[in-house]
Amino acid sequence: MKPRAECCSPKFWLVLAVLAVSGSRARSQKSPPSIGIAVILVGTSDEVAIKDAHEKDDFHHLSVVPRVELVAMNETDPKSIITRICDLMSDRKIQGVVFADDTDQEAIAQILDFISAQTLTPILGIHGGSSMIMADKDESSMFFQFGPSIEQQASVMLNIMEEYDWYIFSIVTTYFPGYQDFVNKIRSTIENSFVGWELEEVLLLDMSLDDGDSKIQNQLKKLQSPIILLYCTKEEATYIFEVANSVGLTGYGYTWIVPSLVAGDTDTVPAEFPTGLISVSYDEWDYGLPARVRDGIAIITTAASDMLSEHSFIPEPKSSCYNTHEKRIYQSNMLNRYLINVTFEGRNLSFSEDGYQMHPKLVIILLNKERKWERVGKWKDKSLQMKYYVWPRMCPETEEQEDDHLSIVTLEEAPFVIVESVDPLSGTCMRNTVPCQKRIVTENKTDEEPGYIKKCCKGFCIDILKKISKSVKFTYDLYLVTNGKHGKKINGTWNGMIGEVVMKRAYMAVGSLTINEERSEVVDFSVPFIETGISVMVSRSNGTVSPSAFLEPFSADVWVMMFVMLLIVSAVAVFVFEYFSPVGYNRCLADGREPGGPSFTIGKAIWLLWGLVFNNSVPVQNPKGTTSKIMVSVWAFFAVIFLASYTANLAAFMIQEEYVDQVSGLSDKKFQRPNDFSPPFRFGTVPNGSTERNIRNNYAEMHAYMGKFNQRGVDDALLSLKTGKLDAFIYDAAVLNYMAGRDEGCKLVTIGSGKVFASTGYGIAIQKDSGWKRQVDLAILQLFGDGEMEELEALWLTGICHNEKNEVMSSQLDIDNMAGVFYMLGAAMALSLITFICEHLFYWQFRHCFMGVCSGKPGMVFSISRGIYSCIHGVAIEERQSVMNSPTATMNNTHSNILRLLRTAKNMANLSGVNGSPQSALDFIRRESSVYDISEHRRSFTHSDCKSYNNPPCEENLFSDYISEVERTFGNLQLKDSNVYQDHYHHHHRPHSIGSASSIDGLYDCDNPPFTTQSRSISKKPLDIGLPSSKHSQLSDLYGKFSFKSDRYSGHDDLIRSDVSDISTHTVTYGNIEGNAAKRRKQQYKDSLKKRPASAKSRREFDEIELAYRRRPPRSPDHKRYFRDKEGLRDFYLDQFRTKENSPHWEHVDLTDIYKERSDDFKRDSVSGGGPCTNRSHIKHGTGDKHGVVSGVPAPWEKNLTNVEWEDRSGGNFCRSCPSKLHNYSTTVTGQNSGRQACIRCEACKKAGNLYDISEDNSLQELDQPAAPVAVTSNASTTKYPQSPTNSKAQKKNRNKLRRQHSYDTFVDLQKEEAALAPRSVSLKDKGRFMDGSPYAHMFEMSAGESTFANNKSSVPTAGHHHHNNPGGGYMLSKSLYPDRVTQNPFIPTFGDDQCLLHGSKSYFFRQPTVAGASKARPDFRALVTNKPVVSALHGAVPARFQKDICIGNQSNPCVPNNKNPRAFNGSSNGHVYEKLSSIESDV
């Protein structure tokens, strides 16, 4: 029990814990696994060096530690090697072997391969026979060699031959294993190469025959190539070289190249080996035995470490060379994969599948004259580096005299010697080039290993060398000189090419070598092969382009003649021809041939010809006359020739002129005294050449000055010339001529086209007293005799810039080239600005004095203008000529108008259907005496309208612009009328009539400005003639206040028509008058003198017709009745402009109820028998009734007139069509005479109307004539006119049947020529065309209920009556498919749109449908014309007008004219002013 207790005591457990901890620590501190490697050295290897190599701590970073066993042995027989390795495996448990020997026995490699295949142990042969080439290895072997493969050595041999351009060779081999691989590698390489290889012979020698000497000798005699490749063992090579020497294949001119297998141990050289033998060998100099042992151990250890890291085990050690089991095979195969791919210390130590290194360290060794192997090259990273750029010829001293292979030095200098790189694909030079070597000077170079690179040379001198060598029969090695250039003697020693020849490193020197006396003392020169000397090269400097270069294609005389012919001759000729042409703008210089038509002035003629010269697409006015057109055509031909000639010569003058420094020679002042010029003249040359020597010997001062400008080479000198650092370059003429000919852009030239100073020549330098001189001279002379030298000169020395054959180089034009054009534009803009300022100064400051405002008399400008007009038109201008007299006063002559009417009717018939519509272009109305037009400055044809004009209240700043226009007009009426001068600049927005509400609205101003007016000649009729009663004055005010847009474009079917002209689309602007009018009277007149735009010119014919009418001499002795009281009228208008208290401002009004109210008013009038001549309530003017004008009552401004004067002024004893006095007419304003006063006409008008009874009616509906005296109701302001059924039937019988729309040209003729008579509406010959098969076939037929209209008691139907629902019917408004009125066109702005924009609202009136019954019971006159209420889009400017002269209201002369009476033409035509656009017509 006691012993058991001791075992279980705590002390026992403590001991166990300590043992456990110590055991765990021991396991944790256990060393990493190790691998046994045996290093076997055979021979006298340095064991100490090897021990130091593997004992270094270089493998501590690996997971496996190498355990190296050094073994030394002397026997190299197979049995000894096998026994020793097997003993090491059983005793030392080795897992790898590193084997090295110092023998040349390739059999050792075969033994090691056998052992590795049997024991599955990795073996590395690192030196000696163990590393020699072994062709066929066992598949299971892990034998690796530190040496190149057969294929690698064959590639290195080919690179050596390629380096020295040895392309012709032969192959000699024995039956040693691997010879087939060697030959196959050579053949495959040369077949797939771009180099022109020539494999002459492949000899396979059998060394086993007893009588082989004679056979081998016979085979070797077949060899003729200078390069021979040999593949065999070292022993076999000794015998082969002995036989080759006997047949003369080892002497001078033959080069043998052998692999490392032949060279073997470099310490032992057989005596049979020829001098100059080249071998590819493993590097023994930089990669010695200790380094190889260290790398061998590292390879095996690294592979085991990688295997352990991935698989956690390493191969088990081999205990015996026998009984190999499967597990050992698996482990060895796995280790073999890691041995192939090994990288140690950043170096790739991998092996190929055949057991050779992938990147071996190879060297090229040469057996020199001392019978020692000399390293002359290195193969590294698949590139060859050789020591000698020219291969040395190793031959006996006695044979040196007979050497025909020469070493030649040259110098790069185009075009004589041009150096290029080798072909990147083949690594060789092309056929037309010669290989040449260029040394590389590096800091680390040694005399034994100078670096160089292979280049290819060509050029003029190289071609001469090739021809000479072929003629003289010698070969050569060419290299580039690195010590200097051509050659200069420094401190008694020559450098450059001359120095190479003097030092006998080269036999000849070929290049651009100048012959001189100093060089001829040390070398011999051949005859010159090219003449040269000293020449000077300069650069073409860019000159400046003149700012007037764009004008230089033509001389100043040509430019002056062109402008004179344009401005004076051609333009004036075209204008004169057009002026006098019967088909041109005949004598109407201002407005063209037709009123409102285009004009043709001298300015337009100049503009036309200017546009033709420069082919500018500008809008021009073409002439109409044949003569002027011919003139323009001839000018166009001139313009083509002029512009083509200018364009063809422009480029020559826009380029920069080049400047070249002119130098006469080396004695020129610029060379001898360069500092006398500013800046100093800079010149230089390339030092150490014949040029510098010549200058130094002859021009010492010049040589001293040019030293600081000397250049390192020709290329540097050319660059300095182009960049402006050098002004002249002095050098050999041959070189400079070539450079000038090949210069890009031909900017470099030689003075005097290659002028040469100090002529000499280029020659070939040969060693002194050499036997080659005579042969070379004869060869050069032969080249001259055969003409080959000229061919070479043409090939190499002629450039593209020579002989002035260079092409013109195109270049971009910069700002310098185009500066003159920009200067001209800048000057034009400056001149335009000055003209603009002068124009404004004259217009705002000096114009008024020239116009006569300052002196109160006609100014100079006015006098000149009227004088020109008098000369052109033959009209005498009197200073105080009556405004009633005018050359156009005869236009109202009755007989003349009849003839014009016939001609116009014919023209209208010929122009039917113009623009696709037969509708009339203008509704002609009867002309009657016009009341005073307060907007006379607009020059529209205006007369009384059957509308009241109720003026809206004044609102500040609402219509200030428009009021200011009216103020300017009325402030200068007297002077304006006397001078017949008008202001149309701001007054062409829209047409106006005398009844225009805006004509009065525009006069309202919150500041009550005073106005001065001039009385006007009108018939003696009241101002309110034709105005409706005051009952509807509010409605007319709303019509004038708003414009009505059709709801056709707003979602409704009804259409509200507008009487606005299709051309009058100008937006109306409004303003207000501020300030004291008395201070502005003068300024108002100044504003009225503003220049009119072209759009206002079309109204001039209207004005002249109207003035002719008004200026007609009075028919009565008392002509004062044509003028109203000036002061009274002025006071009346002043009263209109005063601010009214409690007057409402502008506001939006719902017109629906108002429109209905108007319909009701017409209905009541119809029921009560009201007619067109019904006398209604008094008419309101302005904003109150106190200014109303009632029939028979004097106007407010005429309240001071006596009853006799008023009766005389308002009487009806004047013709309705003309202001002729009716002497036999009673002036009693009662009864029927009161109702038909305005319908009375004189005998002449009646006869004219009955002479040609052409039934026409554009929109006039036959209204019943009153048959009984007017019944005066209790209301003094209302008069009723009953209708006669009989008369209605007669009128119905005479109703028009045809209607057409006038073309614009016809309308213009009517304006100018047929102003007094309305033209025939449509040609009768077109009626048949419209009747059948036409969409207008039924437009001439009466509707079913057309008789209803004649039976109506009231001749004025309701405004809301629809045409298609109207029982009365009537004709269709138009047979045209185009919109009849402007409100049907949504693209024409109206007055209402302007109001909407002004107040920020949308269109605010839409027609409400009316009751059919009401329409039938009370037809409206507007409904007979259109199916929409005729609401003017210019209300507020022009009130709505009835068609023709349907007068409504209490008036002294109300009437409804029938269509048989002649009617004077009214230019206002329902408020329209038609204006022809200049862009519509094209005459060419």
Swiss-Prot record:
GO cellular component entries: cell surface; cytoplasm; cytoskeleton; dendrite; endoplasmic reticulum membrane; late endosome; lysosome; neuron projection
Glycosylation sites: 74, 341, 348, 444, 491, 542, 688
Motif (PDZ-binding): 1482-1484
Region: Pore-forming, residue numbers: 604-623
Positions of the UniProt region annotated as Interaction with DAPK1: 1292-1304
Consequence when changing residue 1439 to A: Found in a patient with Landau-Kleffner syndrome; uncertain significance
Residues the record marks as site: Functional determinant of NMDA receptors: 615
Effect of residue 436 to R: In MRD6; decreased protein abundance; decreased localization to the cell membrane
Result, substituting residue 818 to V: Increased glutamate and glycine agonist potency
Residues in the Cytoplasmic compartment per record: 577-601, 614-627, 836-1484
Keywords of this entry: Calcium, Cell membrane, Cell projection, Chromosomal rearrangement, Cytoplasm, Cytoskeleton, Disease variant, Disulfide bond, Endosome, Epilepsy, Glycoprotein, Intellectual disability, Ion channel, Ion transport, Ligand-gated ion channel, Lysosome, Magnesium, Membrane, Metal-binding, Phosphoprotein, Postsynaptic cell membrane, Receptor, Signal, Synapse, Transmembrane, Transmembrane helix, Transport, Zinc
Consequence of changing residue 461 to F: In MRD6; decreased protein abundance; decreased localization to the cell membrane; decreased glutamate-gated calcium ion channel activity characterized by decreased glutamate potency and increased glycine potency
Intramembrane segments: 602-613
Annotated Polar residues bias: 1272-1289
Residues annotated with Phosphotyrosine modification: 962, 1039, 1109, 1133, 1155, 1474
Subunit field text: Heterotetramer. Forms heterotetrameric channels composed of two GluN1/zeta subunits (GRIN1), and two identical GluN2/epsilon subunits (GRIN2A, GRIN2B, GRIN2C or GRIN2D) or GluN3 subunits (GRIN3A or GRIN3B) (in vitro). Can also form heterotetrameric channels that contain at least two GluN1 subunits and at least two different GluN2 subunits (or a combination of one GluN2 and one GluN3 subunits) (in vitro). In vivo, the subunit composition may depend on the expression levels of the different subunits. Found in a complex with GRIN1 and GRIN3B. Found in a complex with GRIN1, GRIN3A and PPP2CB.
Domain notes: The extracellular N-terminal domain (NTD) endows NMDARs with a unique capacity for allosteric modulation, harboring several binding sites for small molecule ligands that act as subunit-specific allosteric modulators of ion channel activity. A hydrophobic region that gives rise to the prediction of a transmembrane span does not cross the membrane, but is part of a discontinuously helical region that dips into the membrane and is probably part of the pore and of the selectivity filter.
Protein name: Glutamate receptor ionotropic, NMDA 2B
